[in-house]
Regions:
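Amphipathic alpha-helical packing segments from all-alpha helical-bundle domains
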Residues: 1-9, 13-15, 23-50, 93
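C-terminal peripheral helix-coil segments that are non-catalytic and often amphipathic
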Residues: 34, 38, 42-50, 63-109
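Membrane-interface starts of transmembrane alpha-helices
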Residues: 54, 58-62
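Generic structural "secondary-structure junction" signal
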Residues: 10-12, 26, 55, 76, ...
């Protein structure tokens, strides 16, 4: 999971050193966040083709979804300088809220 302490430490390091080690930072980005977004985009495109979602741009939809379900938790973990993450119940509540907002925007009417 992206908010595990070891992953947070690696993300902080790579972000901090991206200017000095751009190839390493890019490799991480392409291997983790970018791959996840590409997978989500493919899923959303498929759901759009089946008439289940209204998706004009699957890549934008993937970014919206990822930030809605993870953005608040990840920002808190990254900026607070602590490896303490939210409780599982809080993470689930935020993810559920993100899914509701996503479906409100993308559900086929």
């Amino acid at each position: 999971m992206v908010i595990q302490p070891q992953v947070l430490q690696l993300r902080r390091l790579l972000i901090g050193e991206a200017g000095r080690l751009p190839k390493l930072s890019r490799a991480y980005y392409e291997g983790a966040p970018e791959r996840t977004l590409a997978t989500l985009a493919a899923c959303f495109q498929h759901l759009g083709e089946r008439g289940l979602l209204r998706v004009d741009d699957p890549r934008i939809a993937a970014n919206h979804f990822a930030f809605l379900i993870l953005g608040m938790s990840l920002d808190r973990a990254m900026f607070c300088g602590t490896d303490k993450t939210l409780a599982a119940a809080d993470l689930e509540r935020l993810a559920d809220a993100g899914v509701r907002v996503f479906l409100a925007a993308y559900r086929q009417t």
